[in-house]
Amino acid sequence: MSIKYSNKINKIRTFALSLVFIGLFIAYLGVFFRENIIIMTTFMMVGFLAVIASTVVYFWIGMLSTKTVQIICPSCDKPTKMLGRVDACMHCNQPLTMDRDLEGKEFDEKYNKKSYKS
């Protein structure tokens, strides 16, 4: 069984998208408590805060995405963004590294940690 690799930027974008849907769902739950205005308002505010949090996450990953290194994936020949020492292609999920010490080694995201010594 092969391991499914995923690009870090796409993981964060997926998290932000899930925050939007979770926030809308929580706010929608407030409709069922129309009789109690406090509970309804609480649900709607928590849902609204989740949507605002997703906006902050989208803004943050957008700013981070502008600082990343763009490379051409050797497998699919498409441009992809590299975040950290090891990452995966955004299109084909091919494990990538720009560190010569890690070439040929098994893909592991622990290589991105500052505490890791190669």
Swiss-Prot record:
A matching Pfam family: DUF2614
Membrane-spanning intervals of the chain: 12-32, 43-63
Highest taxon in the source lineage: Bacteria
Alphabetical keyword list: Cell membrane, Membrane, Transmembrane, Transmembrane helix
Topology in membrane: Multi-pass membrane protein
Keyword Zinc-finger set for record: no
GO cellular-component term (any): plasma membrane
Localization: Cell membrane
Positions in coiled-coil regions: none
Alphabetical list of InterPro entries matching this protein: UPF0295
UniProt record similarity statement: Belongs to the UPF0295 family.
Name by which UniProt lists this protein: UPF0295 protein BA_0538/GBAA_0538/BAS0506
Taxonomic source organism: Bacillus anthracis
